């Protein structure tokens, strides 16, 4: 699953979310 916009942390999802590349930055 992709991170929601505004939830990016250095281009990655927060620990409580699935790790991966965030879309939209």
From Swiss-Prot:
It is found in: Secreted. It comes from the Eukaryota. Keywords: Antibiotic, Antimicrobial, Secreted. Coiled coil: none annotated. GO terms for biological process: defense response to bacterium. One of its GO terms (cellular component) is extracellular region. Bactericidal activity; inhibits Staphylococcus aureus. This is Antimicrobial peptide THP3. It comes from Meleagris gallopavo. The lineage of its organism: Eukaryota, Metazoa, Chordata, Craniata, Vertebrata.
